[in-house]
Amino acid sequence: ISLGLVGSEMCIRDSLKYIVLCEDLSISGINTAGIPDNVMKTLIVDIKFNNKYFERVLHHEVFHIINDSFKEIFNEKTWSSFNSDSFNYAKCSTCTKKIGLDTYSKTNGFITEYSKSTASEDMAEVFSHLMHGNLPKQIDPILQKKIDFIKSGLLKIDQNFDL
């Protein structure tokens, strides 16, 4: 397993101290790949989760810890303003059936179906694809704004952050 966190990515090193590996992880009765706890700087990960997405899920959950530590930098209202006026996120990630993790080839502002659930999940999906190096080949203007927002936020935390 590789987090790909080589170098001086201070925002990650300072935000994450422990990774707990477990099986059959769930929250509110719903199976989940991981649960971030920014207070304890801990990431709980289900090692039985779909291997196809496992490393990307690690990056996704790491972003939640970063996001929770730097809410003022990763503002959800600013993020939501990038979307078309007709789009609204769900109230919570477990309040929607949008759970698909396959990367879209036609993005239309979103990188996966799950990224349409909430603003924080959308940010985490963009970050995970950046870290994992599997962005779609064609990126639309909305998704490009989101990518630039994540990169800019990370550089505000750590000027040496390298994606």
Regions flagged by a language model, labelled:
Residues I1-I12:
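Short, small-residue-biased leader/transition segments that mark boundaries at the very start
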